[in-house]
Amino acid sequence: MRGSCVAWTCALLGATFLSTPCLAQALTSSMLTPSIGGFAPAQDSPLRPVNAIDPATGVPAIYGNPPASGAADTGYDSLNRKRKTKPYPGTPKPKFVGPGNPSNPPLQAPRVVPPVSPSFAGIAEGAPPRRKLKVDGDPFGQVGNYVGGFLVKEAVEVSGGYDTNPGRFAQPQGSAFYRIAPELQATSDWTRHALNLDLRGSFTGYGTTFPADAGNSSVPVNIDRPDVDGKLTGRIDVTRDTRIISALRLRVGTDNPTTPNPQVGLSKYPVYANFGGTLGVEQDFNRLQLQVNGNVDRTVYQYSKLTDGTSASNDDRNFNQYGAQARLSYDLMPGLKPFVEVEADTRVHDLRMDRYGYERDSNGGYLKGGTSFEFSRLLTGEFAVGYGLREYQDPRLKRLDGLLTSASLVWTATGLTTVRFAAASSIDETTLPGVSGSLSRDYSVQVDHAFRRWLIGTARFGYGTASYDTRQDKRYFAQADLIYKLTRTFAIKGSVRHDWLVSNDSGADSNQTIVMLGVRVQR
């Protein structure tokens, strides 16, 4: 019935006179995106031209041939505009790429790579899922070696440079120098308990000797200086809430040229050694934590070698220090832990009287309060403020007391910039006649910025004071470092530093500039 209707319709339209049968209209697959010839094939279209014979040439007319070679989409335009080809009706218009936007890159053929075994690729049947490797935050950092249950890291820096005033003279006298600084760190990798070693040292040698007849200056002829700082800390986990804390420490060095302690006429600086230990217990009571420590330290000076070939004893500067320390802290909230700390100690010298007839034995201590914090790992550290005092047995020596501050803060400003702030205060011994001691305070700010992962720039600024009763010293310094990391093992380091000393004592002012370049080898 349906076919007869189609035939009747074609007859009415005169289709019976056509050489081809009448077909229904063919639609494209998508009405929204039509294409040429999508509705009906070109050869079956009723609107196609008939292949009639041209009466002029007698050759059948052929349609659909491409235009001649000289034809183009462009023609004459008085404004010299290019004629654009109009898109087929209904086709989507191409997206316009504006200025400054990257064009779509051309499609590239996939690379031909060698085949990888399923076990190596982690796609073998029955294989456990492979863990994704962590991104290395410091690709040029020190790796270290495992020795048993310890991770050991060692390094050495060899550098040289020029110091415009190594002796801290009022009238600068410069000298070239070299420095060798080894380091050794060992950290235990145990499930329980801990043992850590941190040992650093340096030796600075100068190629210049200074005259022995430098007036009343305390600068020796040879100013070569060693420096060693080491600490061994341990922890024994008795229970989940009880721990035994222990530590051994060592400090080797010489008197600072900026202090008035060195005597006149030295051939070289006498070396001192400060060593001691700590033993204590740490107990947790829920959020409350109590730590009690006992400390024993000893300070020893070697004999001073004078320019006339004789030696002078420094036994009056040797002393033992015994003390006890207690710290109470409370975990107020995650990342905030306030604390209170108290310490008491006594110092007993080897000789009752020093070289000027003063009794230097004393009792002292401090009380301070502060907090340790960690805010989303962007700001971490500890800050405390307190009060310290020291009473001397000799009534001629005044009590030494004052405000004490201590801080160690790290602020990660960005992923490339880190800011550090440090503060320290101490009550130190002195050899000046009639002076009880010195109260020292030091503050420093350090900014580290990674221009690249292998190029690190550092800027440091510092300020410090030292009070010797009537004498007041102020110290300033500014330093800039640049580290170029070649590999994880080798790095090149350059440094420029300038120091100022301003004192109310006549002739004690000084300034110096240090330029240094060296190589660091680490593993």
Name the predicted role of every residue range:
Residues 2-12, 19-155:
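N-terminal periplasmic/intermembrane-space "pro-region" immediately following the signal or transit peptide
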Residues 154-156, 197-199, 246-248, 292-294, ...:
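Membrane-embedded beta-strand positions of outer-membrane beta-barrel proteins
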Residues 158-166, 192, 201-207, 250-254, ...:
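Transmembrane beta-strands of outer-membrane beta-barrel pores
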Residues 178-184, 226-232, 273-279, 320-326, ...:
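Hydrophobic, lipid-facing positions within transmembrane beta-strands of outer-membrane proteins
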Residues 184-188, 232, 236, 279-283, ...:
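Residue-level signature of outer-membrane beta-barrel architecture
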Residues 192-196, 240-244, 285-292, 335-338, ...:
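Repeated loop/turn-to-beta-strand initiation elements of outer-membrane beta-barrel proteins
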Residues 482-485, 489-491, 495, 511-523:
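Outer-membrane beta-barrel "beta-signal"
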